[in-house]
Amino acid sequence: MGQEKKLALITGAGRGIGKVIALQLAKSGADIALTDLNPELEDLKSELNKLGSKCLDFQVDVTDPEAIDKMVSEVVGSQGRIDILVNNAGITQDNLMMRMKAEQWSKVIDVNLNGVFHITRAVLKTMMKQRSGKIISISSVVGFSGNPG
């Protein structure tokens, strides 16, 4: 990761892929800003601290641009930078599309697409000032293979 310690901001970090990414980046020497809709991030934060990572945690809904802007301001105010953004927050509706309600579809689009837009836009300002940064967006394999009906 180079000489200077990096700061990684990870959405959907509470479990699964986001949690594993947080642990791996901490093992690589990064400090971590965890975000998740679920407020229970204390155990992961403790694990990351044991790995030598400074860790901030935020309960944030990625569909709320004002909450995202506030969180990004807090991260930059505290850490001075954001070097890596991992867009990992996402939801699925376990239903065939032909049975899915419009509200369910709208929620998927709001979290999985609009959420990525909101947080990426908020973080880009900082990365452009730094003249550096990496953005990684996680998506589903279903985007390549599709699902029936």
Describe these PLM feature segments.
Residues 30-43:
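Conserved glycine-rich Rossmann-like NAD(P)H-binding loop of the short-chain dehydrogenase/reductase
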Residues 2-33:
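Canonical Rossmann dinucleotide-binding motif of NAD(H)/NADP(H)-dependent dehydrogenases/reductases
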Residues 96-97, 104-109:
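Substrate-binding pocket helix/loop in short-chain dehydrogenase/reductase
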Residues 59-71, 102:
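The beta1-alpha1 cofactor-binding region of Rossmann-like NAD(H)/NADP(H)-dependent oxidoreductases
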Residues 98, 145-149:
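Active-site loop immediately N-terminal to the catalytic Tyr-X3-Lys motif
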Residues 140:
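Residue(s) in the substrate-gating loop at a strand-loop-helix junction
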